Amino acid sequence: MAKDIKFSADARSSMVRGVDILADTVKVTLGPKGRNVVLEKSFGSPLITNDGVTIAKEIELEDHFENMGAKLVSEVASKTNDIAGDGTTTATVLTQAIVREGLKNVTAGANPIGIRRGIETAVATAVDELKAIAQPVSGKEAIAQVAAVSSRSEKVGEYVSEAMEKVGNDGVITIEESRGMETELDVVEGMQFDRGYLSQYMVTDNEKMVADLENPYLLITDKKISNIQDVLPLLEEVLKTNRPLLIIADDVDGEALPTLVLNKIRGTFNVVAVKAPGFGDRRKAMLEDIAVLTGGTVITEDLGLELKDTTIDALGQAARVTVDKDSTVIVEGSGGKEAVANRVNLIKSQIETATSDFDREKLQERLAKLSGGVAVIKVGAATETELKEMKLRIEDALNATRAAVEEGIVAGGGTALINVIEKVAALDLTDDAATGRNLVLRALEEPVRQIAKNAGYEGSVIIDKLKNSSAGTGFNAANGEWVDMIDAGIIDPVKVTRSALQNAASVASLILTTEAVVADHPAPEAPAAAPAMDPSMMGGMM
């Protein structure tokens, strides 16, 4: 395919147009008075959301060069979401600010490599200062505040804090759709382990790339499955029940994996295969935990059991299993309560006699997975559109809360970024590196400027007053008052703010140092088909 190529200022300006289109669409959602964006879906009702990464992923531009710029910013939002789970709109706003001001300097003759060096130094200093002013998060009330700020809903904050209280900060919390209009919290027995599906073709939801299995059987073994004949009799038995199957094995390879995938694609059989968690003796113990939880038997040579002789009676069962590319969650295993309790007591006794901290830590992880359960937030709403929007807000709140517990919190509403300006400004840099530092100084103001604008205030006035206020004092855009942000519950997780700044600076620097852009040449449109001749006009030809 032929390529179109642009160079220097022409290349950068084309990409920046794409950056601006995407950022201008996303940044209207920032802050307590941010607006929503309506996304057209190819099927079903439109999605109304204020989630930055969801909006960014939907944007495709007709111009290939502009689209590349938009996609780079979308990558900033996605990466920030992957690392911190929130802060995607802030990351987008920061990227646009650095790129926009940086382009002016590069066009005026500044060296982009020097600018990049200054940006990196300034961002590193800002991140260090954010960590230094962070406050730890503890207690149900603080957790509820973080979740409430992220979701813009005190009710959501209560659900998230209650869920984390019941299953622990590192516990498994899932979000489901409720059949009613009310949102409620359930805690059900379950287990999560860090192994995902062996093939992406096993997913049942192509949009979220997850496999949801309702009422599945579980084959649990420490053997490697390479020959499909070893499990064929068992597969035929399960197929008759019309229920899905989760295979947990040492590995599934050879002819076995493509055969399972082919049957899944054809719709013959709903099956998902994952590798067994852990290694060595710890793997055997974890498989036994899963077997006890689900009422199954581990198919292992230690017990003299072979795959080819396995019957459906040896399989575990669960109400639901969810598998993504990285993890598996088993909910409501069918194992007896007494058997689970005995297993829990066994692990507790092993913890007491463990001689190394490492062994004790791993045993405590197993205990948490076996006894902690899974908290399920069931989201209810009046319409499907509201339901989708509510789920996205709760997901953001959950991610932000975990980030806050991990690295602490700072004053929210962009205040913390203003508070670190003094440290960044004090950096002794020269020439183009100083220009890069100044770009970051300007960008650090941008989230506050946009939050104020969305709330109907003049951003420059707010920023000027912020710079002359004591650290932690900020502007509450929801009601127009000046408050101590942390006391008022307007807080951001350090991990979210830090990730947004680091990812924005990284991609913005790459755009500024771009000298050539290569894009596919648009394919010519196919000629329109000639209109069919009216049969009545053929009379003279007969």
From Swiss-Prot:
It holds the Pfam family Cpn60_TCP1. GO terms for molecular function: ATP binding; ATP-dependent protein folding chaperone; isomerase activity; unfolded protein binding. ATP binds at T29, L30, G31, P32, D86, G87, T88, T89, T90, G413, N476, A477, A478, D492. It is found in: Cytoplasm. Signal peptide: none annotated. Its main location: cytoplasm. Keywords: ATP-binding, Chaperone, Cytoplasm, Isomerase, Nucleotide-binding. It catalyses: ATP + H2O + a folded polypeptide = ADP + phosphate + an unfolded polypeptide. It is an enzyme of class 5 (isomerase). Its EC number is 5.6.1.7. One of its GO terms (cellular component) is cytoplasm. One of its GO terms (biological process) is protein refolding. Transmembrane segments: none annotated. NCBIfam families: GroEL, PRK00013.1, PRK12849.1, PRK12850.1, PRK12851.1. HAMAP family: CH60 (MF_00600). Forms a cylinder of 14 subunits composed of two heptameric rings stacked back-to-back. Interacts with the co-chaperonin GroES. Together with its co-chaperonin GroES, plays an essential role in assisting protein folding. The GroEL-GroES system forms a nano-cage that allows encapsulation of the non-native substrate proteins and provides a physical environment optimized to promote and accelerate protein folding. Belongs to the chaperonin (HSP60) family. This is Chaperonin GroEL.
